């Protein structure tokens, strides 16, 4: 694949988005907020606009521990929103149980499920919740984890200057691919990655496979099929798999036998993890 093609694919993945419908149950009515959100981003970044909109209905909303819910399940705001969509909502679309082009989630402001999702622990001087600070802390920790897997240590990210660290965060908030790439290339290995940071999710279960993968086997490069067959043998033991791997909402079964390192380089998320959602065939 030509470098120009890879650049184009990365740009399309970076700019991919979903339609989000946020519903607030208020008294005897349901109020809606409609927006688009980048897949390779975080739902928390939409909270300031969501809070501003719904504050007309709920007093002091910006000071409350807010959380999102989908079909009774609290949404883990620390994960990329595209991954959440594929993990929670995509199976319903593939099974024809839903046909809506937008993802409907509920905004909750009481009974925070802190045993299931990370609480927002920081507050601003005015007493409002500092959502951005919590998200920044989570993303930096994710980048440190992936950096360690890729390099064998976290030195590349820990060695970033203060200016570079600020630029990296701003590029994520602004969703600026060029600015993000210019800093992220200081984190990822210039030559060969020691291991590849991979996380595998299975809808309808709490199973999450966290697998630092060696990019090369004894004789040939490691493929995604190798990884899935090893960790999910009940789904991928046979040549004809009974499940489909989705990355960024794309059915990637055609990439099962491609080198995993190549797939990671193109499809990694902004925290440098490769997230794979495995959906059983219907």
UniProtKB/Swiss-Prot annotation:
GO terms for molecular function: Atg8-family ligase activity. InterPro entries: Atg5, ATG5_HBR, Atg5_HR, ATG5_UblA, Atg5_UblA_dom_sf, ATG5_UblB. This is Autophagy protein 5. The gene is ATG5. Conjugated with ATG12. Pfam families: ATG5_HBR (PF20637), ATG5_UblA (PF20638), ATG5_UblB (PF04106). GO terms for biological process: autophagy of mitochondrion; cellular response to nitrogen starvation; piecemeal microautophagy of the nucleus; protein transport. GO terms for cellular component: Atg12-Atg5-Atg16 complex; autophagosome; mitochondria-associated endoplasmic reticulum membrane contact site; phagophore; phagophore assembly site membrane. Transmembrane segments: none annotated. Belongs to the ATG5 family. It is a peripheral membrane protein. Conjugated to ATG12; which is essential for autophagy. It is found in: Preautophagosomal structure membrane.
């Amino acid at each position: 694949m030509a470098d120009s093609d890879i650049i184009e694919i990365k740009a399309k993945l970076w700019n991919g988005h979903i339609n989000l419908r946020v519903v607030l149950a208020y008294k005897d009515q349901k109020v809606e907020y409609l927006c688009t959100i980048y897949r390779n981003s975080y739902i928390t970044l939409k909270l300031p606009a969501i809070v501003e909109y719904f504050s007309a209905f709920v007093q002091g909303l910006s000071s409350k521990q807010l959380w999102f819910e989908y079909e009774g399940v609290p949404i883990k705001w620390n994960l990329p929103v595209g991954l959440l969509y594929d993990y929670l909502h995509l199976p319903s679309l593939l099974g024809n149980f839903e046909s809506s082009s937008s993802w409907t989630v509920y905004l909750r402001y009481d009974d925070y499920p802190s045993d299931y999702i990370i609480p927002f622990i920081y507050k601003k001087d005015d007493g409002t919740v500092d959502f951005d600070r919590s998200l920044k802390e989570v993303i930096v920790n994710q980048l440190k984890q992936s950096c360690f897997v890729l390099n064998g240590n976290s030195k590349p990210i820990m060695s970033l200057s203060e200016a570079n660290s600020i630029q990296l965060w701003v590029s994520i908030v602004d969703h600026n691919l060029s600015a993000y790439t210019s800093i992220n290339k200081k984190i990822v290995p210039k030559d060969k990655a020691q291991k590849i940071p991979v996380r595998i999710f299975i809808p309808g279960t709490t199973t999450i496979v966290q697998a630092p993968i060696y990019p090369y086997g004894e004789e040939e490069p490691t493929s995604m099929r190798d990884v899935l067959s090893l960790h999910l043998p009940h789904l991928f033991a046979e040549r004809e798999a009974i499940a489909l791997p989705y990355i960024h909402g794309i059915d990637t079964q055609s990439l099962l036998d491609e080198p995993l390192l190549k797939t990671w380089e193109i499809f990694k998320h902004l925290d440098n993890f490769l997230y794979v959602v495995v959906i059983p065939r219907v």
